[in-house]
A protein has these predicted regions:
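Terminal domain-start leader segments
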Residues: 1-195
Length: 195
């Protein structure tokens, strides 16, 4: 049975890719902090594939699309991808290329891989650079193509920070700050960056 909604979304995405000069577009399951479970705003992969599992990467190109996921989700992915035109790539199965291998085998010199670099781990970005540089393939890191297509996209999460009670946290904010400052002074640190 065809999934016209997903097929139409992929058609819009491919048109946007062509407009932006992108030949392959990648969408992982991630947010700006590389969380495994993401807020609805970041469910871009799900929006374009119908796959709702917590782990997977969608890759779209001119005449195809593929979803890479692990063994926990093979059955779920088969069901949810049915009729979408998205092919399932079963990670770690014999004969199934990794995303890097697929890109290396299918991208040609001068082509461009695009993705929203804010949701790709730096380590993965460097891995793609290394693999694709040999073939003189460009990478466009700053492309959130979903934003112009997903018109009813949920709002970006903007909740307030919640301070946990000492019963849960074990110590007060003041105690934690004092301990941190003492450790910094002991180690000769002038600043501490927390992300």
């Amino acid at each position: 049975m065809e999934n016209k909604v997903i097929q139409d979304r992929l058609t819009l995405l491919r048109a946007k890719m062509q407009e932006e000069g992108i030949d392959f577009y990648m969408m992982p399951t991630a947010d700006f902090h590389n969380s495994e479970y993401v807020n609805d705003y970041f469910k871009v992969r799900e929006y374009f594939s119908n796959f709702t599992g917590s782990n997977g990467t969608l890759l779209v190109w001119k005449d195809g699309a593929g979803l890479w996921t692990d063994g926990r989700y093979f059955i779920q992915a088969e069901t949810e991808l049915e009729g979408t035109g998205v092919e399932l790539f079963r990670m770690l199965q014999e004969g199934v290329p990794t995303i890097e291998e697929f890109l290396e085998q299918n991208m040609q010199q001068g082509q461009t891989l695009g993705f929203d670099g804010r949701v790709i781990a730096a380590m993965d970005g460097k891995k793609y650079e290394k693999v694709l540089a040999k073939a003189q393939i460009c990478i466009a890191y700053e492309k959130d193509l979903a934003d112009s297509i997903w018109t009813d996209r949920p709002n970006f999460p903007a909740g307030k920070v919640t301070v946990l009670d000492e019963k849960i946290a074990g110590k007060s904010v003041e105690e934690k700050l004092t301990q941190t400052r003492e450790k910094m002074a002991k180690d000769g640190a002038n600043a501490l960056l927390l992300t």
